[in-house]
């Protein structure tokens, strides 16, 4: 599968080092990390300047990890690490 940012939520399943095509301000409601393989798998999301805006670590029960309500705009968005075959869902306002 490939990244799909055509709807809401955005579905990110591939990290290729290139930023997502939204380098301007993005209004994020919340994010979810799901479908990872083992406890301790990691998902890291940064802004366009490389500042970490969310770090998710896989839980022992393999349930999805939720960010809680962001409710703010971030300057660009990039998923720099996505372990264990997981997916990142980004809900946009």
Residue positions per predicted region:
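Short secondary-structure capping/turn segments at boundaries of alpha-helices and beta-strands
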Residues: 18-19, 66, 76-77
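Noncatalytic modules at the cell exterior or secretory-pathway interfaces
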Residues: 29-31, 70-85
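Beta-rich globular "head" domains
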Residues: 13-47
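C-terminal interaction-tip segments
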Residues: 1-26, 83-93
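Solvent-exposed serine/threonine-rich low-complexity stretches and specific carbohydrate-binding patches
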Residues: 10, 52-61
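Short, surface-exposed beta-strand/strand-loop-strand elements in extracellular ectodomains
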Residues: 37-56, 88-92
């Amino acid at each position: 599968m490939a990244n799909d940012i055509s709807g809401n939520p955005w579905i990110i399943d591939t990290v290729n080092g290139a930023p997502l095509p939204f380098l301007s301000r993005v209004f994020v409601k919340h994010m979810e990390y799901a479908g990872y393989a083992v406890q301790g798998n990691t998902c890291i999301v940064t802004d366009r300047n490389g500042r970490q805006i969310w770090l998710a670590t896989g839980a022992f029960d393999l349930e999805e990890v939720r960010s809680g309500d962001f409710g703010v705009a971030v300057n660009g968005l990039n998923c720099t690490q996505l372990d264990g075959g997981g997916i990142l869902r980004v809900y946009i306002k």
